[in-house]
Design a protein with these regions (language model features):
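Extreme N-terminal starter segment of soluble prokaryotic enzymes
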Residues: 1-3
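Small/polar loops that bind or transfer phosphate-bearing groups
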Residues: 6, 49, 72-73
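N-terminal glycine-rich anion-binding loop in soluble enzyme alpha/beta folds
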Residues: 6-43
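Residue-level recognition of alpha-helix initiation/capping sites
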Residues: 9, 52, 78-79
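General N-terminal targeting signals
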Residues: 19-21, 44, 64-65, 86
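N-terminal beta-loop-helix "entrance" segment that forms/cooperates
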Residues: 29-51, 106-116
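Short acidic active-site motifs
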Residues: 53-57
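Glycine/small-residue-rich loop that forms an oxyanion/phosphate-binding "nest" at active or ligand-binding sites
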Residues: 58-116
Length: 116
């Protein structure tokens, strides 16, 4: 079983790629918002919509026959990634971080107010 920690458009990109290779019946995706869950309605997968703290992560892992975690959570959502890594230290579960390349934003002009 594969657990995808969702939360970005990368989640859907990954699901599209995975669906070409494996049966998505063996995939569970977790998201924290109803909107995130709604975005996954087109996929034939189990979606869990809730905030997972360490205890909930441990409980989820213990109740699920996981062998792989793919973390596609938002880069600023550091707690979920950190908590997962702490929980799986003593487990035989593979962990992968799936993250798009960060692009640098350059501003040409700055404004003091909207009137400018």
């Amino acid at each position: 079983m594969i657990w995808i920690v969702g939360g970005t458009s990368d989640t859907r990109s990954l699901l599209d790629k995975l669906s070409e290779k494996i049966n998505l019946n063996n995939v569970i995706v977790s998201v924290t918002t109803e909107y995130g869950e709604k975005l996954l309605n087109d996929y034939n997968i189990k979606v869990i919509q809730k905030v997972l703290d360490k205890n909930k992560i441990l409980d989820f892992i213990d109740k699920t026959n996981l062998n792989t975690i793919i973390d596609t959570s938002h880069p600023y959502a550091e707690n979920i990634s950190k908590n997962i890594l702490e929980v799986i230290k003593s487990k035989n579960i593979k962990y992968f971080r799936y993250e798009r390349e960060v692009t640098e934003t350059i501003f040409d002009e700055r404004f003091e107010s909207l009137k400018d």
